[in-house]
Amino acid sequence: MEVVEVLHMNGGNGDSSYANNSLVQQKVILMTKPITEQAMIDLYSSLFPETLCIADLGCSLGANTFLVVSQIVKIVEKERKKHGFKSPEFYFHFNDLPGNDFNTLFQSLGAFQEDLRKHIGESFGPCFFSGVPGSFYTRLFPSKSLHFVYSSYSLMWLSQVPNGIENNKGNIYMARTSPLSVIKAYYKQYEIDFSNFLKYRSEELMKGGKMVLTLLGRESEDPTSKECCYIWELLAMALNELVKEGLIKEEKVDAFNIPQYTPSPAEVKYLVEKEGSFTINRLETSRVHWNASNNVKNGGYNVSRCMRAVAEPLLVSHFDKELMDLVFHKYEEIISDCMSKEKTEFINVIVSLTKIN
């Protein structure tokens, strides 16, 4: 499985689309707003750029993508008015892997711009937008061309399934039953990928440029702790139930692994300091409930829909597409049972960085 070819959120605007099932991600963006706001204020008041070049890495599609744009424009407009300056030109780069539904994203752009003008008037900008398909574990932009890099709920995804994890039988991710070699392989791939991310962004950001990165993570130093692995353990349970029913071959489940690593703040800090191009302004964690909806009764349904929007393309690349309704129905039942018995939360790691030179 080539991750770069199959990793993307469900496109379009259907029942299983990411656009209609990304409330958790929206809440996380709103929770992170004060950190984004401070980074943008510090950036603008130190550089006063006439053109602001901003990259949203792992932008996906839907309202959340434009929520980030709206936040940034409003922050800068408020700040530049304080100083009595003319509004800068905004240049937003939307980056994601080639399988992302860029068409749906850009079809919504006109309506978003019109709505933004209604809220803050005609005096800002102009704003320019471009789509940049490609992996953020490679170079994406010219040297020293960016002022600000934003990424939310993307950097936990790895560039590939780690090598040497063939013995992770019965699991689809790191779990307490995973051999130590599997845990080490996952961390090694994360270390390679995040180090490359920092290296390439250090080349693309100008001196004094900022990054605000939010990713699924963990507070524990145990990479197999429930706070980061449980959601995938439950999906593995659903798949293994279908194995027992004879609908999926056991070898198919054994050969499937999620290309993701959810780091602790200490792991993020270590790699940032090791790479050496950035200072850490803030590094913190937050929590968000699996069921971000106010509809508590349908919690299992809401969470399984959210996870389907995220994971279905990966699953379809390995299992029969016709099985997906059954897989996620099983998953919903398992999640509902789990949520009735225990507290279920995602842990977020947020880091704000400044480019040193």
Swiss-Prot record:
Amino-acid positions noted as binding S-adenosyl-L-homocysteine in the UniProt annotation, renumbered to this chain: 18, 59, 64, 96-97, 135-136
InterPro entries found in the cross-reference section: MeTrfase_7, MeTrfase_capping, SAM-dependent_MTases_sf
EC number per UniProt: 2.1.1.273
Organism domain of life: Eukaryota
Binding-site residues for Mg(2+), renumbered to this chain: 168, 254, 256-257
Keyword S-adenosyl-L-methionine annotated: yes
Keyword Flavoprotein: no
Catalytic activity: benzoate + S-adenosyl-L-methionine = methyl benzoate + S-adenosyl-L-homocysteine
Annotated site (Involved in substrate discrimination): 150
Pfam families for the chain: Methyltransf_7 (PF03492)
Positions annotated to bind benzoate: 25, 157, 260
Listed Gene3D superfamilies: Methyltransferase, alpha-helical capping domain, Vaccinia Virus protein VP39
Entry GO MF terms: metal ion binding; methyltransferase activity
GO biological process, one term: methylation
Keyword annotations: Magnesium, Metal-binding, Methyltransferase, S-adenosyl-L-methionine, Transferase
Pathway: Aromatic compound metabolism
Family: Belongs to the methyltransferase superfamily. Type-7 methyltransferase family.
Function: Converts benzoic acid into the volatile ester methyl benzoates. This scent, mostly produced in a rhythmical, diurnal manner, attracts the pollinators.
Name of this protein: S-adenosyl-L-methionine:benzoic acid/salicylic acid carboxyl methyltransferase 3
Name of the gene this protein is made from: BSMT3
